[in-house]
Every structure is written in structure tokens, then in C-alpha cells.
């Protein structure tokens, strides 16, 4: 019978495990084919930029070199791996994992951002429901993943502070996505989630932005916000409920989110509560955070026949969304269009409901994306639904011309990327001010954690970055825990709580440093539990904004 491990050896083993543990959560990203046309693969060839391992399920198969290029097919539910010499390496039904400790895993022939696609973390080949096909999944730490997201979602010329704001928004989005598209992965690598092109597209400045916001998310109350963002709001951001439907019930408008509310770039902007005010705003170019965007203001034109053809071509497909009433079947004609009638707008002037009036029916179209995809111009959707229409008729009352005046690109909810760039570079605003403009009533903090006295729980570690070396521990001490032990940057500390007050705020600044900090929290030894997060404070993080 083996001797029990000594306490010192247990501690050594624990330290080794912790040193090799991820500094941030692991997430799973579905990798699409070229042009993101599909997330189902039939054939793929894998290589690496350094030595790598292959695993059959959990079983290691061996170590391979950069000269070893492996082709994978799925035949009769089995994965078959063949090297360049035609030798079969594995024939198995288990998922296959490729891992390189010091290099990247590449997918031969796959391009991202015009360069070969290579990835940090692991590449996993997993079976899917389609016969002889599979998914490719990149399992990767959140902080490493963001390096491949931020420069592809926002140009690095927008500057460090805007990139830091984008980093926080993207971190929130992957940790709390609106929709999980597939049980095999959390997000995909396209605009269906957020654009992720892998390691070959990383940039020095965007990597710095990720580093200088490490571990930081935006919270409303105790929850991660849904950090929606788009290219260009057009001078007004829009409320969530006026743009998105409920994921489960499809109800529109959906339930509101108190941190995603319509807001003008400047307080002096007049409320867009009439058609005349909407027209005046989007036909003009007021001073705006978005003014440098090529889509800040735009125009589109159709002849009467062009608008007829566009609506007829798109209405059946858009009817499948459930947001056109009455629905139109494929091949069904809609009649001659007489007018486009705006029935309802959001606070930014965004069209929520549009009536397509024809000579034999009135079709009610809801939701900005459906409206944009219905009213295509030269085959392309409208940049946004922040739009007003001018319509001209001939002597017989027939619609002969439509002109659209619009502003913005995308849904316009939450952070405007062009707006963030302007705020950071032109107005010299720090990232937290940018975020707090677009997301109302938030705090910037680490992800909330719960510490309990359950036997299977021992420690929780959080790593985060603070430029000022200042932060407070925000605690919900519902069960009146007296204290917990912690290790802050390798120094042991007892954190005591005021049990007379359920909510505690404890200044950690004296134990922190400017830059990266790591805190290991030990679970309470006695029954009970607490929840808490670490909130950034200080001039650079909160910009003297004490809201």
C-alpha cells in the first residue's frame, strides 16, 4: 500500500498545478471554412509551427514535428488521420486534439485576414450530426482569444484607449454571449459572434490593450452585461429592446436592459420624437463621436421598379424570420408597391416597424435587421435602419423614386466602434469613460465569484490588471462570514468583514501593484459563503466618475 503524501509534497504538487493552470477561463470557438460559408468540415489538413501532440480522446498518440502534416477525414463515424506518406496514424470515433506547447496549430488552406490561419491553444476535431462531417473547435484561454479578436473588430489606428474599451466589450461578449450557436462551442469566429482570426493577425497595440484590461469585465449589479457593439451608431445609440427580439420567445420589442439604453453623443442633441426631427438629424451632419466613419451619413436611391424588385426578391426569405405580417411564401407576388410607411421608431430614430403598402396588401415589417435586408440597394442591405425616406410619384400616383437618408452602420446598440475611436484619439478620453458612455450604470471589475465552505472547493484565483494599483473588494456577505484567507501577489493576508453590514467594500490598494495582480482566495472554513468582485478605482480607471 502506498504511503500517504506528506503535506510539503502536496503543497509542491499543488503549486506546480497552479503554475501551469490557465490564467483565464477556457472558451471554445467554432472555426468556419473560408468565407465562413460553413461550420461543417469534410476534410482538413493540420500542421504546427513547433512540435505538437495528438490526442485520441484523452489518450496521447505521440509527439510530432513541423514536418508532420496530418490529413483528417471522417468516414462511417470514424476519424481517419493520415500523414503525407499515406500512412494511417489513427482510426477512431473519439474527438481528436492537436496541442503545441511552444507553437501554433495551423489549418492548411484556411485564410483569415489574408494570411494563413494559425491558432493559440488547442485545435479539437469533434463529430457533428451530419454524416461524415465534423466541427473544428479552438479551445483557448479568454485572454489569448481576445488577441485574435480586438484588432479584427477595431482598427488599431483608433488608439489604445478605444482598443481597451473594445477589449472589455469583447471579453464580456465571449463570457456572456447572447446566443450559444452550437453545443460543441461557445462562439464562432465570424460576425455571427465576434470576428476572431487567430494568432497571425495579432497586433502589438491591440495586444497591449488586452493586457491592460486583463480580467476586467463590465458589470451591472452582480451580472456581466451583454456588451453589444457595432461599427457606427450615427450620433445616437439605441435601446436594446427596440432592436433585438427575445432569443427564446421571439417577442419584439424584447425586454429592456437598463445598461443598453438610447443615448445621444452630446446632451444638446434634440430628442428624435417626430418624423421631422428624425429627417433633420439624418439629413444633416452634426458634430458627433461618429463623424469620422464613412457611414456616419449615407444616401441610397431606387427607381420605383428597383424598390419593387428588391422587396419582391427578399420578402419571402425575410418572412421566415417571423417578423413580416402577413408572411409571404416563395413565388408569391406582393402587388405593386405604393408607399413605404414608417409606423414606429426607436429613440435614435431607428425604424422598428415599417409598412410596405401595395395595391392589394399592407405588410408590416418589424426589426431593424429584417428591414435592412428587405430594402436592399444594388444587392446590399441598408447600412442601418436609422433612415428616412423621400418618395416621389408620377401624375398617375405611381411610386417612381425613393431616396433614403441614413446614419450609422450596424444595429447601433451599445458601444459604437468609430465613436470609441474618436473619444479616445480626439477627445483623449480613457477607456472607462468610453465604456460608461455607451453602457449605463456599469462598474468595471473582475468576474463575480462565490466562495463557499463545500469540501470540494479550496481556492479561487483571479488575475487582473490595474494601471493605478487601486481596487476595492466588493462583498455580499449574506451569511455573515467573519473572514477569509487570501494570497495577494504572493503575500498571505486575512481579509476581515463587518458582519453587521451585508455589503462590504474593502480597499485592497495597499496590497496591489500597478499592472498585473493575482489574488488567490481561500474558501471559508466554517459553513457559509460569500460572493464578491474586485472593482477598479482611481483616476485612470474611473476618471473621477463616482456614479
Segments predicted by a language model, with ranges:
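Conserved, single-site charged/polar hotspot
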Residues: 1-472, 477-506, 510, 514-547
